């Protein structure tokens, strides 16, 4: 069972704030760059990675100031992947990212399914893209031994 997150775009800071679903107001937001097309190399995860929050199914990188690896990968200008569609992947993702300002609040699963998988389902490449997104994270989970999987329903 993976953790469920609410995504909320903060247009003032141009970041996507992530909060566990049902968390009290004391929970701090997890932010990651959304519009900035940065490098796909994940920065070091801070020592205070939020393990005290006991969120099942979240990789340690979810508590990084740069945000979860999967979100960083979607906004990367260059994605070093085995996905054959890499030559047009950034353009499609950039186009879809520009439309995020209309979003209010949604969960991470719906965000990825809409932004990443819709076009590739039609091309029959969803599985390879899914493997890239899930397999790209090199960080360990905080409280669960299962593989990093943002798409499993709670």
UniProtKB/Swiss-Prot annotation:
Major site of localization recorded for this protein: host cell
Subunit structure, as described in the record: May form homodimer. May interact with host CEBPA, CFLAR, CREB1, DDB1, E4F1, HBXIP, HSPD1/HSP60, NFKBIA, POLR2E and SMAD4. Interacts with host SMC5-SMC6 complex and induces its degradation. Interacts with host TRPC4AP; leading to prevent ubiquitination of TRPC4AP. Interacts with host PLSCR1; this interaction promotes ubiquitination and degradation of HBx and impairs HBx-mediated cell proliferation.
Cited function: Multifunctional protein that plays a role in silencing host antiviral defenses and promoting viral transcription. Does not seem to be essential for HBV infection. May be directly involved in development of cirrhosis and liver cancer (hepatocellular carcinoma). Most of cytosolic activities involve modulation of cytosolic calcium. The effect on apoptosis is controversial depending on the cell types in which the studies have been conducted. May induce apoptosis by localizing in mitochondria and causing loss of mitochondrial membrane potential.
Annotated localization: Host cytoplasm; Host nucleus; Host mitochondrion
Keyword Transcription: yes
Region feature Mitochondrial targeting sequence, mapped onto this chain: 68-117
PTM summary: A fraction may be phosphorylated in insect cells and HepG2 cells, a human hepatoblastoma cell line. Phosphorylated in vitro by host protein kinase C or mitogen-activated protein kinase. N-acetylated in insect cells.
GO BP terms in the entry: DNA-templated transcription; symbiont-mediated activation of host NF-kappaB cascade; symbiont-mediated arrest of host cell cycle during G2/M transition; viral genome replication
Species per Swiss-Prot/TrEMBL record: Hepatitis B virus genotype D subtype ayw (isolate Australia/AustKW/1991) (HBV-D)
Keywords: Activation of host NF-kappa-B by virus, Activator, Apoptosis, Host cytoplasm, Host G2/M cell cycle arrest by virus, Host mitochondrion, Host nucleus, Host-virus interaction, Modulation of host cell cycle by virus, Transcription, Transcription regulation
Listed name of the protein: Protein X
Record-linked InterPro entries: Transactivation_prot_X
GO cellular component labels: host cell mitochondrion; host cell nucleus
Family per record: Belongs to the orthohepadnavirus protein X family.
One Pfam assignment: X
Keyword Transcription: yes
């Amino acid at each position: 069972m993976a953790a469920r997150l609410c995504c909320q775009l903060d247009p003032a800071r141009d970041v996507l704030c992530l909060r566990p679903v049902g968390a009290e107001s004391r929970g701090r937001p997890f932010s990651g760059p959304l519009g900035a097309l940065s490098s796909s190399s994940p920065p070091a995860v801070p020592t205070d990675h939020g393990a005290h929050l006991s969120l099942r199914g979240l990789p340690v990188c979810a508590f990084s100031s740069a945000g979860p690896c999967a979100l960083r990968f979607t906004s990367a200008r260059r994605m070093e992947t085995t996905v054959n569609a890499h030559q047009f992947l950034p353009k499609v993702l950039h186009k879809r990212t520009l439309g995020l300002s209309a979003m209010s609040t949604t969960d991470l699963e719906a965000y990825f399914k809409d932004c990443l998988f819709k076009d590739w389902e039609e091309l029959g490449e969803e599985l390879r893209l899914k493997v890239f997104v899930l397999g790209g994270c090199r960080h360990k989970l905080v409280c669960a031994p299962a593989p990093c999987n943002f798409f499993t329903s709670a």
